[in-house]
Amino acid sequence: MKNFLIHETGVHFIDVFRYLFGEPQTLSADLRRLNPAIAGEDAGHFIFYYENGLRAQFDGNRLLDHAAKNTRLTMGEMLIEGTKGSLALYGNGDLLHRLPGNTEWQTITYPFDDNDFGGDCVFLMQKHIVDHLKKNTPLQNTVADYLKNLQLEELIYESAKTHTRLDCAHE
């Protein structure tokens, strides 16, 4: 597979970053292949730069592990830091919050089933779409939204190839 880390894993973070922070203005990326037995990149990072000064960074490496008993929880870990607090999502599904000035993290409980791939995210996505088709429930995602994710994925690969920061043109 020519495109690996960003195509298989990073695209989900593109989606999450867009959901949480909106559309990036520019991006930069540095990708590399560490394992010579595969065709695509397996390590690297990309940064989304936002008009308001916010930065969102993905730093991934398919050769490293993270804290999870279930190795099918392959999405890694995430840390969000801001002026109103910090959120941490760990590889085992633990979600924590810390307010500014506090030293202790508070656990956020939420419904999470540690079964099948990625906490059963594929099943839940398929159920969501079937519910929309059968019951006319609203979709939380659209083809147009996902196509924008794929456009940003392509820009990430272009940025890594050209070693340049690229504009994320918005229609």
Residues covered by each model-derived region:
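Short linear motifs in exposed loops
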Residues: 59, 90-91, 109, 142, ...
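Active-site loop of classical SDR/Rossmann-like NAD(P)-dependent oxidoreductases
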Residues: 114-126
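Conserved anion/nucleotide-ligand pocket segment
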Residues: 1-11
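Contiguous beta-strand/loop segments that form the cofactor/metal-binding neighborhood of enzyme cores
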Residues: 8, 14-93, 123-135
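Short polybasic amphipathic segments
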Residues: 78, 93-104
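Short beta-strand segments
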Residues: 56-58, 106, 139, 166
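C-terminal "lid/loop" region of Rossmann-like NAD(P)-dependent oxidoreductases
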Residues: 66, 107-117
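C-terminal helix-rich "cap/oligomerization" subdomain common to oxidoreductases
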Residues: 39, 51, 128-171
